[in-house]
A protein has these predicted regions:
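Acidic, glycine-rich two-metal-ion catalytic cores of nucleic acid-processing enzymes
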Residues: 229-230, 234-342
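N-terminal leader/targeting and assembly helices and adjacent pre-domain segments
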Residues: 1-244, 249, 257, 339-342
Length: 342
Protein backbone atom coordinates (compact mmCIF):
# COMPACT_ATOMS: atom_id res chain seq x y z
CA UNK A 1 0.00 0.00 0.00
CA UNK A 2 2.86 2.39 0.79
CA UNK A 3 4.13 2.13 -2.81
CA UNK A 4 0.77 3.38 -4.09
CA UNK A 5 0.71 6.12 -1.47
CA UNK A 6 4.21 7.24 -2.41
CA UNK A 7 3.31 7.28 -6.11
CA UNK A 8 0.22 9.37 -5.36
CA UNK A 9 2.31 11.72 -3.21
CA UNK A 10 4.84 12.12 -6.02
CA UNK A 11 2.14 12.93 -8.59
CA UNK A 12 0.40 15.52 -6.41
CA UNK A 13 3.58 17.24 -5.23
CA UNK A 14 5.08 17.34 -8.72
CA UNK A 15 2.04 19.29 -9.90
CA UNK A 16 2.00 21.54 -6.84
CA UNK A 17 5.71 22.31 -7.13
CA UNK A 18 5.43 23.23 -10.81
CA UNK A 19 2.38 25.42 -10.13
CA UNK A 20 4.13 27.26 -7.29
CA UNK A 21 7.32 27.87 -9.29
CA UNK A 22 5.28 29.03 -12.28
CA UNK A 23 3.31 31.38 -10.05
CA UNK A 24 6.58 32.87 -8.76
CA UNK A 25 7.72 33.46 -12.35
CA UNK A 26 4.43 35.09 -13.31
CA UNK A 27 4.73 37.38 -10.30
CA UNK A 28 8.25 38.32 -11.39
CA UNK A 29 7.31 38.88 -15.05
CA UNK A 30 4.43 41.12 -13.99
CA UNK A 31 6.99 43.53 -12.49
CA UNK A 32 9.02 43.78 -15.71
CA UNK A 33 8.23 46.85 -17.83
CA UNK A 34 9.36 46.61 -21.47
CA UNK A 35 9.47 50.40 -21.89
CA UNK A 36 11.87 50.70 -18.96
CA UNK A 37 14.07 47.96 -20.43
CA UNK A 38 14.04 49.72 -23.80
CA UNK A 39 15.02 53.03 -22.22
CA UNK A 40 17.99 51.37 -20.53
CA UNK A 41 19.04 49.60 -23.74
CA UNK A 42 18.92 52.92 -25.61
CA UNK A 43 21.66 54.30 -23.35
CA UNK A 44 25.43 54.43 -23.92
CA UNK A 45 28.01 52.02 -22.50
CA UNK A 46 27.50 48.29 -21.96
CA UNK A 47 28.51 48.41 -18.28
CA UNK A 48 26.08 51.24 -17.59
CA UNK A 49 23.29 49.39 -19.42
CA UNK A 50 23.97 46.21 -17.42
CA UNK A 51 23.78 48.17 -14.17
CA UNK A 52 20.49 49.80 -15.21
CA UNK A 53 18.96 46.49 -16.25
CA UNK A 54 20.02 44.91 -12.95
CA UNK A 55 18.14 47.66 -11.11
CA UNK A 56 15.04 47.35 -13.31
CA UNK A 57 14.97 43.55 -12.93
CA UNK A 58 15.86 43.83 -9.22
CA UNK A 59 18.74 41.35 -9.51
CA UNK A 60 20.65 40.40 -6.37
CA UNK A 61 24.41 39.80 -6.16
CA UNK A 62 24.00 36.36 -7.78
CA UNK A 63 22.04 37.78 -10.73
CA UNK A 64 18.76 36.31 -9.48
CA UNK A 65 15.61 38.48 -9.42
CA UNK A 66 14.76 39.23 -5.79
CA UNK A 67 11.05 38.70 -6.45
CA UNK A 68 11.84 35.22 -7.74
CA UNK A 69 14.08 34.36 -4.78
CA UNK A 70 11.36 35.50 -2.38
CA UNK A 71 8.83 33.42 -4.30
CA UNK A 72 10.74 30.20 -3.63
CA UNK A 73 9.64 30.13 0.01
CA UNK A 74 6.49 28.12 -0.68
CA UNK A 75 8.19 25.60 -3.01
CA UNK A 76 10.95 25.16 -0.43
CA UNK A 77 8.45 24.38 2.33
CA UNK A 78 6.58 22.01 0.00
CA UNK A 79 9.76 20.05 -0.78
CA UNK A 80 10.79 19.87 2.88
CA UNK A 81 7.44 18.36 3.86
CA UNK A 82 7.51 16.06 0.82
CA UNK A 83 10.83 14.40 1.63
CA UNK A 84 9.72 13.82 5.22
CA UNK A 85 6.43 12.28 4.09
CA UNK A 86 8.13 9.95 1.58
CA UNK A 87 10.69 8.78 4.14
CA UNK A 88 7.91 8.15 6.67
CA UNK A 89 5.86 6.11 4.16
CA UNK A 90 8.92 4.09 3.14
CA UNK A 91 9.73 3.39 6.76
CA UNK A 92 6.11 2.37 7.35
CA UNK A 93 6.54 -0.39 4.76
CA UNK A 94 8.70 -2.08 7.40
CA UNK A 95 6.15 -1.25 10.10
CA UNK A 96 8.56 1.27 11.61
CA UNK A 97 7.40 4.67 12.79
CA UNK A 98 9.80 7.38 11.65
CA UNK A 99 10.42 10.59 13.58
CA UNK A 100 10.16 13.13 10.75
CA UNK A 101 11.70 15.81 12.96
CA UNK A 102 14.82 13.75 13.60
CA UNK A 103 18.31 14.68 12.47
CA UNK A 104 18.34 11.84 9.92
CA UNK A 105 16.14 13.89 7.59
CA UNK A 106 18.07 17.15 7.97
CA UNK A 107 20.39 16.41 5.05
CA UNK A 108 17.42 15.48 2.86
CA UNK A 109 15.73 18.79 3.59
CA UNK A 110 19.00 20.52 2.74
CA UNK A 111 19.10 18.60 -0.56
CA UNK A 112 15.57 19.77 -1.32
CA UNK A 113 16.49 23.42 -0.76
CA UNK A 114 19.70 22.93 -2.75
CA UNK A 115 17.63 21.71 -5.71
CA UNK A 116 15.79 25.03 -5.82
CA UNK A 117 19.12 26.82 -5.42
CA UNK A 118 20.50 25.10 -8.51
CA UNK A 119 17.36 26.00 -10.43
CA UNK A 120 17.72 29.66 -9.47
CA UNK A 121 21.44 29.62 -10.32
CA UNK A 122 20.67 28.26 -13.80
CA UNK A 123 17.99 30.92 -14.16
CA UNK A 124 20.42 33.67 -13.17
CA UNK A 125 22.99 32.43 -15.71
CA UNK A 126 20.36 32.47 -18.45
CA UNK A 127 19.19 35.97 -17.48
CA UNK A 128 22.79 37.15 -17.74
CA UNK A 129 23.05 35.64 -21.22
CA UNK A 130 19.75 37.25 -22.25
CA UNK A 131 20.99 40.64 -21.05
CA UNK A 132 24.15 40.32 -23.14
CA UNK A 133 22.06 39.37 -26.17
CA UNK A 134 19.83 42.40 -25.61
CA UNK A 135 22.82 44.75 -25.31
CA UNK A 136 24.69 43.52 -28.36
CA UNK A 137 21.83 42.21 -30.50
CA UNK A 138 20.35 43.88 -33.55
CA UNK A 139 17.03 45.66 -33.78
CA UNK A 140 15.49 48.63 -32.05
CA UNK A 141 15.78 49.04 -28.27
CA UNK A 142 12.05 48.30 -28.01
CA UNK A 143 12.40 45.05 -29.98
CA UNK A 144 15.44 43.96 -27.94
CA UNK A 145 13.61 44.81 -24.71
CA UNK A 146 10.62 42.70 -25.73
CA UNK A 147 12.94 39.80 -26.57
CA UNK A 148 14.71 40.17 -23.22
CA UNK A 149 11.44 39.93 -21.31
CA UNK A 150 10.42 36.87 -23.34
CA UNK A 151 13.69 35.15 -22.46
CA UNK A 152 13.32 35.58 -18.70
CA UNK A 153 12.88 32.17 -17.07
CA UNK A 154 14.26 30.19 -20.01
CA UNK A 155 17.51 28.24 -20.01
CA UNK A 156 20.51 29.58 -21.91
CA UNK A 157 19.83 27.12 -24.72
CA UNK A 158 16.14 27.95 -24.88
CA UNK A 159 16.91 31.66 -24.97
CA UNK A 160 19.43 31.17 -27.77
CA UNK A 161 16.88 29.24 -29.84
CA UNK A 162 14.32 32.00 -29.29
CA UNK A 163 16.87 34.54 -30.57
CA UNK A 164 17.38 32.47 -33.73
CA UNK A 165 13.62 32.30 -34.30
CA UNK A 166 13.25 36.04 -33.75
CA UNK A 167 16.08 36.82 -36.18
CA UNK A 168 14.60 34.55 -38.85
CA UNK A 169 11.17 36.14 -38.58
CA UNK A 170 12.66 39.63 -38.60
CA UNK A 171 14.63 38.80 -41.75
CA UNK A 172 11.37 37.77 -43.38
CA UNK A 173 9.52 40.88 -42.18
CA UNK A 174 12.29 43.18 -43.39
CA UNK A 175 11.82 41.90 -46.95
CA UNK A 176 9.64 44.31 -48.98
CA UNK A 177 6.07 43.23 -49.58
CA UNK A 178 4.58 43.61 -53.05
CA UNK A 179 0.89 44.18 -53.75
CA UNK A 180 -0.51 42.61 -56.88
CA UNK A 181 -3.61 44.65 -57.80
CA UNK A 182 -7.01 43.07 -58.32
CA UNK A 183 -7.48 41.73 -61.81
CA UNK A 184 -9.82 39.70 -63.98
CA UNK A 185 -8.60 36.49 -65.59
CA UNK A 186 -9.38 35.30 -69.10
CA UNK A 187 -12.51 33.53 -67.88
CA UNK A 188 -13.86 36.78 -66.49
CA UNK A 189 -13.32 35.79 -62.87
CA UNK A 190 -12.17 38.63 -60.63
CA UNK A 191 -9.01 37.87 -58.63
CA UNK A 192 -8.69 39.99 -55.47
CA UNK A 193 -5.48 41.88 -54.68
CA UNK A 194 -2.74 39.71 -53.16
CA UNK A 195 0.46 40.35 -51.25
CA UNK A 196 3.73 38.58 -51.95
CA UNK A 197 7.17 38.84 -50.41
CA UNK A 198 10.45 38.40 -52.21
CA UNK A 199 11.98 36.66 -49.18
CA UNK A 200 13.90 33.44 -49.77
CA UNK A 201 12.21 31.48 -47.01
CA UNK A 202 14.15 28.33 -47.87
CA UNK A 203 17.45 30.13 -47.29
CA UNK A 204 16.16 31.68 -44.06
CA UNK A 205 15.12 28.27 -42.74
CA UNK A 206 18.40 26.68 -43.85
CA UNK A 207 20.31 29.26 -41.80
CA UNK A 208 18.56 27.99 -38.65
CA UNK A 209 19.57 24.33 -39.03
CA UNK A 210 21.43 22.99 -36.03
CA UNK A 211 20.41 26.02 -33.99
CA UNK A 212 16.73 25.33 -33.38
CA UNK A 213 14.63 22.17 -33.28
CA UNK A 214 12.63 20.78 -36.19
CA UNK A 215 9.41 21.75 -34.39
CA UNK A 216 10.62 25.33 -34.01
CA UNK A 217 11.61 25.44 -37.67
CA UNK A 218 8.12 24.25 -38.65
CA UNK A 219 6.61 26.94 -36.45
CA UNK A 220 8.41 29.79 -38.20
CA UNK A 221 7.94 28.14 -41.61
CA UNK A 222 4.16 28.24 -41.10
CA UNK A 223 4.41 31.88 -40.06
CA UNK A 224 6.47 32.82 -43.12
CA UNK A 225 3.99 31.07 -45.39
CA UNK A 226 1.70 34.01 -44.67
CA UNK A 227 2.73 37.01 -46.84
CA UNK A 228 0.51 39.23 -44.67
CA UNK A 229 2.54 38.41 -41.54
CA UNK A 230 2.99 41.53 -39.41
CA UNK A 231 5.37 42.45 -36.62
CA UNK A 232 2.50 42.04 -34.16
CA UNK A 233 1.86 38.52 -35.48
CA UNK A 234 5.54 37.61 -35.08
CA UNK A 235 5.61 39.04 -31.55
CA UNK A 236 2.52 37.04 -30.60
CA UNK A 237 4.12 33.86 -31.95
CA UNK A 238 7.37 34.47 -30.05
CA UNK A 239 5.53 35.37 -26.84
CA UNK A 240 3.51 32.17 -27.00
CA UNK A 241 6.52 30.00 -27.76
CA UNK A 242 8.51 31.55 -24.92
CA UNK A 243 5.64 30.80 -22.52
CA UNK A 244 5.53 27.20 -23.75
CA UNK A 245 9.28 26.74 -23.28
CA UNK A 246 9.19 28.29 -19.80
CA UNK A 247 6.29 26.01 -18.87
CA UNK A 248 8.13 22.96 -20.20
CA UNK A 249 11.29 23.84 -18.29
CA UNK A 250 9.44 24.31 -15.00
CA UNK A 251 7.49 21.05 -15.43
CA UNK A 252 10.65 19.13 -16.35
CA UNK A 253 12.64 20.50 -13.40
CA UNK A 254 9.76 19.81 -11.01
CA UNK A 255 9.30 16.25 -12.28
CA UNK A 256 13.00 15.47 -12.15
CA UNK A 257 13.50 17.07 -8.75
CA UNK A 258 10.52 15.35 -7.14
CA UNK A 259 11.58 12.00 -8.61
CA UNK A 260 15.13 12.36 -7.31
CA UNK A 261 14.00 13.43 -3.83
CA UNK A 262 11.39 10.65 -3.69
CA UNK A 263 13.93 7.92 -4.43
CA UNK A 264 16.36 9.38 -1.91
CA UNK A 265 13.57 9.66 0.66
CA UNK A 266 12.53 6.04 0.18
CA UNK A 267 16.09 4.84 0.69
CA UNK A 268 16.46 6.99 3.79
CA UNK A 269 13.25 5.59 5.29
CA UNK A 270 14.26 2.00 4.54
CA UNK A 271 17.74 2.40 5.99
CA UNK A 272 16.38 3.95 9.17
CA UNK A 273 13.94 1.05 9.51
CA UNK A 274 16.80 -1.39 8.92
CA UNK A 275 18.92 0.33 11.55
CA UNK A 276 16.17 -0.24 14.10
CA UNK A 277 15.84 -3.91 13.14
CA UNK A 278 12.46 -3.49 11.48
CA UNK A 279 13.54 -5.05 8.16
CA UNK A 280 14.36 -8.73 7.55
CA UNK A 281 18.02 -9.40 6.80
CA UNK A 282 17.29 -10.50 3.22
CA UNK A 283 15.58 -7.26 2.18
CA UNK A 284 17.09 -5.66 -0.91
CA UNK A 285 16.31 -2.90 -3.36
CA UNK A 286 15.11 -3.88 -6.83
CA UNK A 287 15.16 -1.67 -9.92
CA UNK A 288 11.80 -1.24 -11.65
CA UNK A 289 11.16 0.45 -15.00
CA UNK A 290 7.84 1.93 -16.08
CA UNK A 291 7.36 -1.22 -18.18
CA UNK A 292 6.08 0.37 -21.38
CA UNK A 293 7.36 1.08 -24.88
CA UNK A 294 8.73 4.48 -23.82
CA UNK A 295 11.38 2.90 -21.55
CA UNK A 296 14.83 3.54 -22.98
CA UNK A 297 16.99 0.52 -23.75
CA UNK A 298 19.70 1.60 -21.32
CA UNK A 299 17.14 1.87 -18.51
CA UNK A 300 15.61 -1.52 -19.35
CA UNK A 301 19.04 -3.12 -18.93
CA UNK A 302 19.37 -2.19 -15.25
CA UNK A 303 17.15 -4.97 -13.75
CA UNK A 304 19.17 -7.58 -15.66
CA UNK A 305 22.41 -6.06 -14.40
CA UNK A 306 21.14 -6.44 -10.81
CA UNK A 307 19.16 -9.72 -10.96
CA UNK A 308 19.01 -10.28 -7.22
CA UNK A 309 18.61 -6.65 -6.27
CA UNK A 310 21.17 -4.78 -4.18
CA UNK A 311 21.65 -4.27 -0.42
CA UNK A 312 20.24 -1.04 0.92
CA UNK A 313 23.70 0.48 1.33
CA UNK A 314 24.96 -0.51 -2.14
CA UNK A 315 24.47 1.17 -5.55
CA UNK A 316 22.90 -0.36 -8.63
CA UNK A 317 25.02 -1.33 -11.62
CA UNK A 318 23.79 0.64 -14.65
CA UNK A 319 25.03 1.38 -18.19
CA UNK A 320 25.98 4.81 -16.81
CA UNK A 321 28.06 3.39 -13.96
CA UNK A 322 27.07 2.75 -10.35
CA UNK A 323 24.03 4.71 -9.17
CA UNK A 324 22.37 4.70 -5.76
CA UNK A 325 19.01 5.85 -7.13
CA UNK A 326 16.94 6.72 -10.15
CA UNK A 327 16.60 8.93 -12.12
CA UNK A 328 19.38 7.88 -14.47
CA UNK A 329 18.88 10.92 -16.72
CA UNK A 330 16.25 13.43 -17.82
CA UNK A 331 12.86 11.80 -18.34
CA UNK A 332 13.71 8.65 -16.41
CA UNK A 333 10.63 7.05 -14.78
CA UNK A 334 12.41 4.16 -13.06
CA UNK A 335 12.21 3.57 -9.32
CA UNK A 336 13.43 1.25 -6.59
CA UNK A 337 11.18 -1.17 -4.72
CA UNK A 338 11.82 -3.11 -1.54
CA UNK A 339 11.75 -6.90 -1.48
CA UNK A 340 13.56 -10.13 -0.66
CA UNK A 341 16.47 -11.38 -2.75
CA UNK A 342 15.24 -13.31 -5.82
Amino acid sequence: MSDDQIDALIASHEMQLADQIEAAFLQFLATVNVDQLASALDDMGADHIRAQLAIILDLDDTGTPQVLSDGMGSPGALLASFVAAVAALASAQAKHSLNTNGTALASMRADAIAMLGRFLADTATAIGAAIESAIYGSGTPQARAAQLKRSLGLTVRQGASLDVMQAALQHFLDTPRTLTPARTDTAGIRIPPTYTRQANTRAILASTRGRISAAQRQLIARAMANPKLTQADADTLLDGHARAMRHFRIRAVSSEGIHDLAETGKLTGWRIAQRFGALPADQRRHWRTAGDERVRHTHAQVPGMNPGGVPLDQPFNTPFGKRMNAPLEWGCRCKATLGAAH
